[in-house]
Amino acid sequence: MSKPSDHIKRPMNAFMVWSRGQRRKMAQENPKMHNSEISKRLGAEWKLLSEAEKRPYIDEAKRLRAQHMKEHPDYKYRPRRKPKNLLKKDRYVFPLPYLGDTDPLKAAGLPVGASDGLLSAPEKARAFLPPASAPYSLLDPAQFSSSAIQKMGEVPHTLATSALPYASTLGYQNGAFGSLSCPSQHTHTHPSPTNPGYVVPCNCTAWSASTLQPPVAYILFPGMTKTGIDPYSSAHATAM
């Protein structure tokens, strides 16, 4: 890289005058020594010199400075340092703070690859879910079997709508779920006739074990009537 012809060098100071001969001598004695290492050693040796030893070099530096001022009266020292790249300094204008791992599996301290095993085994993944308030999903029609409805009737009447995960989103009111079967209120729910996936409350009397009887099949032979078999028919005939 060629230097500009109008560039004016600075006048040497006392250390530069002294080190000019010392640098050449040290480079000849240590040809493999780097220039930066030579400068460090020369600086340490210059500090060890006394004022009497430095005086000749200080006087020589003053003479060179006076001569430099005569030759270049308008000289002003302007360092040719390259400006620092502001883009490198402010590369990230809006630094983002570290928020930690957002993966709940990593936060739980699971080893790498454990998430794949949990996806393939739903039973293992279910252990990390919070316990649900409702034992059955309100969106699965297959859950509404006779045993499921019977278990839903055993839910205490203190169950609030906020305890059910889908009650607010499906539009259920407190009264709908607050009227689940309770021994003191004698109310229960029935599956919806139009949509099996929903249950509707009713205020009819509670079912008892005596009233829940299976249907009876009747076989009538020639010459026989249903009067002697059906108690309701006999009672109706007596009233007539």
Swiss-Prot record:
Tissue expression per record: Highly expressed in developing brain and spinal cord.
GO annotation, biological process: entrainment of circadian clock; negative regulation of DNA-templated transcription; negative regulation of transcription by RNA polymerase II; regulation of neuron migration; visual perception
Coiled-coil zones: none
Protein name: Transcription factor SOX-14
Role noted for this protein: Acts as a negative regulator of transcription.
GO cellular component: nucleus; transcription regulator complex
SUPFAM superfamilies (UniProt xref): HMG-box (SSF47095)
Main location: nucleus
Keywords, sorted A to Z: DNA-binding, Nucleus, Repressor, Transcription, Transcription regulation
